[in-house]
Amino acid sequence: MSNQVKIFDTTLRDGEQALAASLSMKEKLQIALALERLGVDIIEAGFPVSSPGDFRSVRSIAQEVKNATVCGLSRALEKDIDACGEALSVADNFRIHTFIATSDIHVANKLRKSQDEVVEMAVNAIKHAGRYTDDIEFSCEDAGRTPIDYLCRMVESAINAGATTVNIPDTVGYTTPTEFGGIIQNLFNRVPNIDKATISVHCHNDLGLAVANSLVAVEYGARQIECTINGIGERAGNCSLEEIAMILQTRQAMLGLNTNIRSHEISRTSKLVSQLCNMPVQSNKAIVGANAFSHSSGIHQDGVLKAQNTYEIMTPESVGINKNNLNLTSRSGRHVIKHRLEELGYKAEDYDLDTLYASFVKLADKKGQVFDYDLEALLFFDKQKPADEHYKLLYLQASSGKEIIPSATVKLQVGEEEIIESCTGNGPVDAAYKAIIKVLGHEQLEIVDFKLDSKGEGADALAQVSVIVEYNGRRFNGIGLATDIVESGVKALIHVLNNTHLADQIDHQKKQQTQTAGV
């Protein structure tokens, strides 16, 4: 049996299901390219049949990703599989992942079919997927609660039908490592054709056992792990990619297993997903948390200074955390910024140096010193700006204080027109938002969520505002970054407005295409 474990990342599919607002196509592509750079073997890009937006995102990722297999999810239905086949057809390498529930609970209450009928549906779906590709994955949804005899029968039938990967999900995170390891062991002992397919696992974290169950599965012969960056996902999340990858790397001598993950890319991939998904990483999170390599105990600090491995089983550098907190100032030149970004793991093609440097100088003039976390925040935010901004902030003034009615004046460029409005509110941000809504001339926007995070340390740290807005029945996410909280909040709302404008343009184009096709 091979000692190579494939890493199947489902951040863009299962992970996105945990978000309050969907990622934009541009954001999904950013994450996909980061996963490719990380060394992920298979990227599950989405569920193409679920919406036109998801279809376009999967197709865009399929076109751009060259060094990983791009995968689309489908139910065991022909229309789902056809949508996958069409969306993925532009990829160099692609996989169709189809699934059906197999536990008694699901078969009886959700599918309302007999076990024989479910097997037939699975076989037909796999054969239909074979019209598009030889790389077919089949999942037995809720395998963790499926009777072992029926699970063995389903796996054997799926492989005979043409599935090259069979996935065994612990869909509700119910099993313990002993139970889940026993399921995998039983499959290898009882399914006669199991050597003709890769056995995969997809573990949820409802009882905090997703990583442990994934680990025991590969010890019993599974050779693909489905996981997500930062462990994000439905309910309590999924197996954390960074945790399982570093377990296999750190304990390689004992486990004898390898992956293609480039561990030095873990930290920045984690940061990117955290930023784009608006899901902060807990400080004590293994591998990527802010405290993962911190030592406060005097005894521990003394030990680490004498020999790093006294209290560190891996180095921060091994996951891409650089300890050099070089302080940059407005006197630092472009070459210094470029060099520092190279040390942080960013390549020249990851950013526009002129644009980034202009933002850096403005920030340095305000703060005096700019730190690594500031620089990375600027790089991230500059990437989020649309190439063609329909809405631009030209002027902002806000006032508030004790015994003062909060007010704000905002001047926006809307297309070719400049509009200025003033409003009062319950606070300076509320006043600024009301002024912007007056500029728009309508009240179709509903603020669903407003979140403020500090990016850095001290009172002069950058403020990042993430705002979720409901517009025409859809949710849009925006991010703003500034040393001033009100400015950051306004930038976040303008980011949303540009996203809604782009969505309106796409909807208009689709209507025109439909009308043209009907003529």
UniProtKB/Swiss-Prot annotation:
SMART domains referenced in this protein's UniProt entry, alphabetically: LeuA_dimer
So what EC number does this one have? 2.3.3.13
The UniProt record gives the binding positions of Mn(2+) as: 14, 202, 204, 238
Pathway note: Amino-acid biosynthesis; L-leucine biosynthesis; L-leucine from 3-methyl-2-oxobutanoate: step 1/4
Query: Main localisation, per the record?
Result: cytoplasm
- Respond yes or no to whether keyword Ubl conjugation is given for this record: no
Instruction: Please list the residue ranges annotated as the Pyruvate carboxyltransferase domain.
Output: 5-267
GO MF terms held by the record: 2-isopropylmalate synthase activity; acetyl-CoA C-acetyltransferase activity; manganese ion binding
Q: Which UniProt keywords apply?
A: Amino-acid biosynthesis, Branched-chain amino acid biosynthesis, Cytoplasm, Leucine biosynthesis, Manganese, Metal-binding, Transferase
Cofactors needed by this protein, per the record, are:
Mn(2+)
> What GO terms fall under cellular component here?
cytosol
Enzyme class comes to: transferase
Q: What does this protein do?
A: Catalyzes the condensation of the acetyl group of acetyl-CoA with 3-methyl-2-oxobutanoate (2-ketoisovalerate) to form 3-carboxy-3-hydroxy-4-methylpentanoate (2-isopropylmalate).
Quaternary structure and partners: Homodimer.
Listed NCBIfam families? leuA_bact (TIGR00973), PRK00915.1-1 (NF002084), PRK00915.1-3 (NF002086)
Name of the featured protein:
2-isopropylmalate synthase
What is the species of this protein? Pseudoalteromonas atlantica (strain T6c / ATCC BAA-1087)
